[in-house]
């Protein structure tokens, strides 16, 4: 199914509604990482060049109370966007009403307007998050065409993506197009050998992803806290490392299904306390003492994973290999990140979330083919699910 892209739309003199993903991390009213804003620029600039009137909207955080509203305004995003575009971005501190409508009606071709956090509509009854039909229809009435560029919420059925799309000719923005191409391509038609690396704390978060990737990938390497549930299922002693007791049978079943594909750690970095300062040693995976816990994969596992990656043509990485926020337990994540970044001739994709943060912190971001902007959306896409935000984009 080929979806419409923004370049398929007639934009001149049109009011172009753009659902962006400006759900950026904030501290004390300041944006701490503007990557999602930067990723939206190609679509916005294209509409400006084509003589469209840009009407941007997005959610930011979870809004349940009036106090949340005070802390989660999109005003700082408008300011940052204005700097990045080097032009005025008009901010309207409302999600509906006369002030917003007259500001939109006064727009000239090439103008840019951002209105307030869509989740302000959740305070009195979750209208945005429950895809309230009236709200979707109202927002749609503000524009002539709709561009959905918010991959980060593509797995949600909200008024601001699916609701609006019900009423208008809808196209993917360039970021959404890129996500469909890379993440969708991995699931549907990867170049082989295809190696997936999964980390993070819990098996329960990634059951669907593991199941689907065992079908489509040639190898699935498992690190992070979730590896210990698999190791326990093999009968190994894991000390007091993270364990999901109720997922041991599932882990056995997955290992049975993926016996030639699943690769688990062979050594671990262990310590007594959940702290960066204790005594640390690297031990073989079947020698974790009862009073210790593993907080990272060991050097031999980094080497093993590096060997498994050799010659890969497609690599997807989702989730850190250890507690990478603590410097002494970041080496596994750093090692894997380096190994992927140094591959020649491979399509390398990071599936958002903590792995993306790790790659950026380490300065490897530009070494990857694609870093997804969607954590949950990437995971659900990798599960092989049809995402409502993508489904609702018009077909070509």
Curated annotation (Swiss-Prot):
Listed GO biological process terms: gluconeogenesis; glycolytic process
Entry keyword set: ATP-binding, Cytoplasm, Glycolysis, Kinase, Nucleotide-binding, Transferase
Pfam families: PGK
Protein name (Swiss-Prot/TrEMBL): Phosphoglycerate kinase
Subcellular location: Cytoplasm
Recorded GO CC terms: cytosol
An annotated Gene Ontology molecular function: ADP binding
Pathway per the UniProt entry: Carbohydrate degradation; glycolysis; pyruvate from D-glyceraldehyde 3-phosphate: step 2/5
Family of this protein: Belongs to the phosphoglycerate kinase family.
Xref: CDD domains: Phosphoglycerate_kinase (cd00318)
Oligomeric form and interacting partners: Monomer.
Catalytic reactions of this protein: (2R)-3-phosphoglycerate + ATP = (2R)-3-phospho-glyceroyl phosphate + ADP
Residues annotated for ATP binding in this entry: 206, 325, 352-355
Binding site residues for substrate: 21-23, 36, 59-62, 119, 156
EC number: 2.7.2.3
